[in-house]
Amino acid sequence: MAVVPASLSGQDVGSFAYLTIKDRIPQILTKVIDTLHRHKSEFFEKHGEEGVEAEKKAISLLSKLRNELQTDKPFIPLVEKFVDTDIWNQYLEYQQSLLNESDGKSRWFYSPWLLVECYMYRRIHEAIIQSPPIDYFDVFKESKEQNFYGSQESIIALCTHLQQLIRTIEDLDENQLKDEFFKLLQISLWGNKCDLSLSGGESSSQNTNVLNSLEDLKPFILLNDMEHLWSLLSNCKKTREKASATRVYIVLDNSGFELVTDLILADFLLSSELATEVHFYGKTIPWFVSDTTIHDFNWLIEQVKHSNHKWMSKCGADWEEYIKMGKWVYHNHIFWTLPHEYCAMPQVAPDLYAELQKAHLILFKGDLNYRKLTGDRKWEFSVPFHQALNGFHPAPLCTIRTLKAEIQVGLQPGQGEQLLASEPSWWTTGKYGIFQYDGPL
């Protein structure tokens, strides 16, 4: 196997990883502590003094975590017994064995950035589960729900578009169907801009109708493998036996507006018969501020269904029906909230890898998935995507991502360098997007 480059880390002063660890992560921790403070009366109403004491305990644990981060203390093992605790602690030991630091301890600014961020969110979860009876509390729930409520006009526009499309879908010729598929893929791409971890938990609602902006946004798609996706799925549709299935898996990113765009794409896949089943993978615990959990998934569908708007409500009712019929299936797996890069999946989570191998196509949404697919390493811009996947090839896959981290592969020679020279922050603001495919052509 080819030598893989070093991991991105906070050692590179001034890098996006460094600034994330120095500024954004402490800001997110401060917001989490503030959220717990603001819910103090709710905890008292539900649980009496016990709830208030639990809130104090959680805040104390989180304040300690913030201090560890800001003073670059060594990582400490997880202590609360949870389904993934042993795997986490083994990984922390493994990472420590790789370090050349004088005391051989993993620290915030010297460890791989991917590990640092995942560890921080896992420690937030530990602080909550160590504080019963408020151990059920999702510290990011409010901001995820605000993102959804703040995007109502855009959601109504998308639901209306989808319902009108479904009503005429049988009259569309192949080129028209392809155009609509590409349109909804692009909406799912730009929906990925709504990332609350990038904004430090500040509002990132979608206030404009993305449908009207697609032409203007096209120049910002750096890699466009949508044709490969169409070719793959339309071929599956043409050659499918009557009783056989075409499975598309979507590894989700953000809840709120982005999740709506993903569900609209998933609805279109069924309505157009490009797929017969859509499987969704979310996070088992609150993660990276806005990532989708099973609670977020069910809550959002319920909200859409109970909307006062005719077409929005119809979408929600349809989506609920798909779930009842088994055409949409939501899966939980702890692997998605581990710090491992995806090339480790066959060893760490062979059951999940075997499940992914059943897919005809896997869509990986967002930046964290891209970082884990490529190992979050200092790859050259022109390294082929297939190579950067480092042996992770369960099924044909495509990453749909707006760029918010200093990692990108598969570009034309000189393309990344040119962008860097003209626009130093081109790969960290969400301005540019990619559809990057790996699989048979």
From Swiss-Prot:
Superkingdom of the organism of origin: Eukaryota
Catalytically driven reaction(s): beta-D-fructose 1-phosphate + H2O = D-fructose + phosphate; beta-D-fructose 6-phosphate = dihydroxyacetone + D-glyceraldehyde 3-phosphate; L-glutamyl-[protein] + S-adenosyl-L-methionine = [protein]-L-glutamate 5-O-methyl ester + S-adenosyl-L-homocysteine
Modified-residue entries (N6-acetyllysine), positions: K40
Keywords of this entry: Acetylation, DNA damage, Hydrolase, Manganese, Metal-binding, Methylation, Methyltransferase, Nickel, Phosphoprotein, S-adenosyl-L-methionine, Transferase
Residues given in the record as S-adenosyl-L-methionine binding sites: E258, D291
Entry-linked Pfam families: ARMT1-like_dom
E.C. designation(s): 3.1.3.-, 2.1.1.-
Chain positions of motif Subfamily III RTxK motif: 401-404
Positions that bind substrate: D253, N254, D367, L368, N369, Y370, R371, K404
Modification type N-acetylalanine: residues: A2
Cofactor (UniProt): Mn(2+); Ni(2+)
Name of this chain's protein: Damage-control phosphatase ARMT1
Record gene name: ARMT1
